[in-house]
Design a protein with these regions (language model features):
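Short, small-residue-biased leader/transition segments that mark boundaries at the very start
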Residues: 1-13
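Asp-based phosphoryl-transfer active-site loop
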Residues: 14-31
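Active-site phosphate-binding/coordination module
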Residues: 29, 36-129
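Residue-level signal for inorganic ion chemistry
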Residues: 45, 78, 158, 200, ...
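Short, structured coil segments at secondary-structure junctions
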Residues: 69-70, 78, 173-176, 229-230, ...
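Short hydrophobic/aromatic-enriched beta-strand-loop microsegments
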Residues: 71-79, 135, 179-182, 233-237, ...
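Conserved acidic, metal-coordinating active-site core of Asp-based
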Residues: 105, 109-229, 238
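Asp-based, Mg2+/Mn2+-dependent phosphohydrolase catalytic module
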Residues: 150, 229, 234-269
């Protein structure tokens, strides 16, 4: 299903959209700001009328505000909440019943969890894996006094420290949620019918765009669905082997300004 990739930039730019993962794709891991070349590429894409969409497992609360560039659209919680400046495009929270089961399952493993709503990230305890997971997004893990209240609001995602061997215990008796992992010490738990793929589908419908008018850049296993949901899926040079397998193209490493280089060589900027 490898299309003629050179057909992508020749359309009217206003009919194009590019989805970007954040960590390891736009941003070098643990960096706070985008490289100058990445900012330049994004601004030139935007000047050419191309829509720019952040597509991340992060919560709206932990979205970075990069200096020098504004994105049009945000696909957060691995696709469960998509919005732009004016409205919500798609909202798909986890059922309250499953949220409570997941909290109990984590508790039986001796693991604290963090619940993420549109406006809050609240944890019921502290452990080093969860704390380190927070720090990747430059957040400080603190225990929320109102955890119970927040966990009864619309929860889009749960975060907890665990290993792959714990996955089945965490999901015990849970029908409507699944694990989306991009790090070996912690997981995001999202709706079973969620994922970046469904989010992208909803964003494309909203803007009346076809799959062939969309491009995506990613680096982790949680980007596999995203790359398969667009006309042209590009894996970063630093991407996981599994992602490179499904990608239409592979660009340079994030540390070598892979996005800038790809956009330049493909005539997008």
């Amino acid at each position: 299903d490898h299309r003629d990739l050179h057909s992508f930039p020749t359309r009217r730019s206003s009919d194009l959209i590019i989805f970007f993962d954040i960590d390891g794709t736009l941003l070098r891991l643990r960096a706070k700001e985008l490289s100058e070349k990445t900012v330049e590429a994004l601004n030139r894409l935007k000047a050419n009328g191309i829509r720019l969409c952040i597509a991340t497992g992060r919560t709206p609360v932990s979205l970075p505000h990069f200096s020098g560039i504004e994105f049009d659209t945000f696909l957060t919680f691995n696709g469960s909440l998509c919005y732009n400046d004016t409205e919500t495009i798609f909202s798909n929270p986890i059922s309250p019943d499953d949220v409570q089961k997941l909290i109990r399952n984590a508790d039986s493993l001796g693991r604290p969890v963090s619940v993420a709503t549109k406006s809050r990230l609240a944890a019921n305890g502290f452990d080093i894996d969860l704390s380190d997971y927070y720090s990747i997004a430059h957040l400080q893990l603190t225990v929320a006094k109102d955890f119970e209240q927040v966990s009864n609001e619309e929860v889009y995602q749960l975060l907890l420290g665990c290993r792959e061997t714990d996955y089945s215990a965490i999901l015990k008796d849970v029908d409507g949620a699944k694990i989306a992992a991009w790090w070996d010490r912690a997981v995001d738990i999202i709706p079973a019918n969620g994922g970046k793929g469904i989010g992208i589908q909803k964003v494309l419908e909203y803007y009346h765009l076809d799959k062939s008018e969309a491009l995506a850049f990613g680096d982790g296993n949680n980007d596999i669905e995203m790359l398969l949901s667009v006309g042209t899926g590009v894996a970063m040079g630093n991407a996981s082997p599994q992602l490179k397998e499904v990608a239409d193209e592979i660009c340079k490493d994030v540390a070598e300004d892979g996005i800038y280089d790809y956009c330049l060589t493909h005539g997008l900027i």
